[in-house]
């Protein structure tokens, strides 16, 4: 059973997050291992396994990138275990330049420049995310998979910039 079916939701990228949360809470209550404490060892094990599956499904579906990766996996694109990466050399060069810029900002300890950098990366991420949503809605899986790969780069860059921001603020 796929995660969308487990939560009683259609297998689409855009989903009702409130319904997802409510269904998660219902499933947690229904299959919590403590409810099976007086059951047989097999029932207890099954409850623990089912609870773990529910938690994994929840973590996967509630985060936009992992939800996109999971949806793509249902259509034959296993991005989580694939070995190849982005082949777009212009994009990769841009990522290298952005990483170098972030290193320069760190060396200079320039908070104002970092704030501008974070906004720029967020804008880039948001634009590419919107493109991914359209690609998933149109079921252009191969193109969406490439966009998700690029979003991973931007997400890591954004995370690095935010970590630097915390470091500079604590300094």
Swiss-Prot record:
An example Gene Ontology molecular-function term: ATPase activator activity
Record keywords: Chaperone
Record domain J: where: 2-74
Signal peptide: none
PROSITE patterns for the chain: DNAJ_2 (PS50076)
Domain of life: Bacteria
Pfam families, sorted: HSCB_C
Similarity comment: Belongs to the HscB family.
NCBIfam families the UniProt entry points to: hscB, PRK05014.1
Function: Co-chaperone involved in the maturation of iron-sulfur cluster-containing proteins. Seems to help targeting proteins to be folded toward HscA.
Designated name of the protein: Co-chaperone protein HscB
Species per Swiss-Prot/TrEMBL record: Citrobacter koseri (strain ATCC BAA-895 / CDC 4225-83 / SGSC4696)
Encoding gene, per UniProt annotation: hscB
């Amino acid at each position: 059973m796929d995660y969308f079916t487990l939560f009683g939701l259609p297998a689409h990228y855009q989903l009702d997050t409130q319904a997802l949360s409510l269904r998660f809470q219902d499933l947690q209550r229904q299959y919590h291992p403590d409810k099976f404490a007086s059951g047989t060892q097999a029932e207890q094990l099954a409850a623990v396994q089912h609870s773990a599956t529910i938690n994994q499904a929840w973590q996967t579906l509630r985060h936009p990138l992992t939800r996109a990766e999971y949806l793509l996996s249902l259509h034959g694109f296993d991005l989580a275990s694939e070995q190849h990466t982005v082949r777009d050399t212009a994009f990769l060069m841009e990522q290298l330049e952005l990483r170098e810029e972030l290193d320069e900002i760190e060396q200079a300890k320039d908070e104002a420049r970092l704030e501008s950098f974070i906004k720029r990366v967020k804008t880039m991420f948001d634009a590419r995310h919107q493109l991914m949503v359209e690609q998933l809605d149109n079921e252009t899986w191969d193109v969406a998979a490439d966009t998700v790969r690029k979003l991973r780069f931007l997400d890591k860059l954004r995370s690095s910039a935010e970590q630097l921001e915390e470091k500079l603020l604590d300094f």
